[in-house]
Every structure is written in C-alpha cells, then in structure tokens.
C-alpha cells in the first residue's frame, strides 16, 4: 500500500543522530555552571530550558555539536563571559564555541542597556551562519512557549518579568521571527512563527503583521 504524506507536513530527519560521552559531559558542564539559576520568576531549574532547546535542535535534525551548543548557549552570557567561551572551546571544540558565541548577546557584566543589546544581536543574527541560526531559533521558540504558558496562567503581569516590558518583548520576538523566516523555513522557524502569532493574539494583536 502506497504511503500518503500530507502536504506541508514537517518531516523528521531520517539521519541517525548519535549522542556520546561529549554530550553527557556538556550536560554536566551546563548543570554545574547554571546550578542555582532558575527561569524568570519561577522555581524551575534553568537547566530545563537548556534541555528543551537541545531537544528542539535534535528534533530539527541537528547533530551532536549543535545539541551541545544548545545546552551551552547561555553559559557565556550568564556564567563567566569571555573566559568561559575559551573554556567551552577547550572542552568542546571550535564549532561548538562558535555557535555559543553566536547565541550570546553580551559577554560582559553589567550587560549593556536592553534595547541597544537586542538591536545589536538582531544585526548580528542576520549575518550569522546556519548552525547559529538553528540553535538561536530553538532558544527563542522555547522562550516564547514559556511566555505563552505564563501568560495563560497570570495574564498581563507576565510582562513585568522582562526588561523590555510588553512592547519591547513583543517587538523583539516579532523581529526575530522575521529574521529567521527570511533565512529559512524549517521545523523550528515554522513553530516559532505560530508561537509568536499566538502570543500576538493573546496580547492584543500585532499592528505590523499586515495579515500575517
């Protein structure tokens, strides 16, 4: 019997992805360095976000290097800055370090002002390579899904958790959505588009969507 594939149905990669001791070491490294950190205004261990991003990357066909980069994508920004990037490169290689660096919007403390930092990151992301875009898009998808969940639970007060407030946060994720979609439509970017669309609907609409 001939198998029927639905039009536009996302297809999982058929390539077998092997995760070995390096991935386990990366998980331990991430758990150690993010120990005590939690998601915004919650008791959820931060490692849950990193695991979620790595899962999305693997589901989209990313290899072990990209899954490791997903686990470590915040370790420079939140756990040590530029010296930490050198440690990532030493332990996990140049490709992983390049993606982690590409997903970092600040490697100094205190961080630069929010708006300027996000605008700079968006400019950087437009020219980033495909590996970085994949991991970054997975990160943003996981973030938007978390915002959606929290919005359903507590409503408009969710925006007080973010430096950009309501308007800044919505602007940031709308802009990122557009950057990713201009580059490629894949499993993650399609899901990000839908998640941002849902967030816009809950928050009162996107005046710049033009019917998106």
Task: Pin down the residues of each PLM region.
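Active-site helical microenvironments for divalent-metal-assisted chemistry
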Residues: 2-212
